[in-house]
């Protein structure tokens, strides 16, 4: 299914059932893109485990509202480099320089 691998940017819900958690995570990560991922669960251990394993910049758990002005917006892989929004977004417009002086 192309909607699994392409960012379609439309009002589409790509829903599928999986036999195992590992199968679901593998299918979600089988793409060269990784802007956002979404899943539903009531199991806190599973929520943290799956959220860490998903190769995407934003994860929505039981919610689709992952983009607000105070949260970092950005993806992994070919879905963008860097973050917009939040204090992390300011880092994209900054140049950090270390100047180390030895004994003068």
Locate the predicted segments by residue.
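Conserved C-terminal structural/oligomerization subdomain of aldehyde/semialdehyde dehydrogenase
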Residues: 1-104
């Amino acid at each position: 299914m192309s909607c699994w691998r392409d960012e379609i940017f439309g009002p589409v819900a790509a829903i599928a059932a999986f036999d195992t958690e590992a199968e679901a995570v593998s299918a979600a990560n089988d793409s060269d893109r990784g802007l956002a991922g979404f899943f539903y669960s009531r199991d806190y251990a599973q929520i943290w485990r799956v959220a860490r394993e998903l190769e995407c910049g934003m994860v929505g758990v039981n919610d689709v509202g992952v983009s607000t002005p105070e949260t970092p917006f950005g993806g992994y892989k070919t879905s963008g480099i860097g973050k917009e929004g939040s204090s992390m977004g300011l880092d994209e417009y900054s140049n950090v320089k270390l100047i180390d002086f030895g004994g003068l």
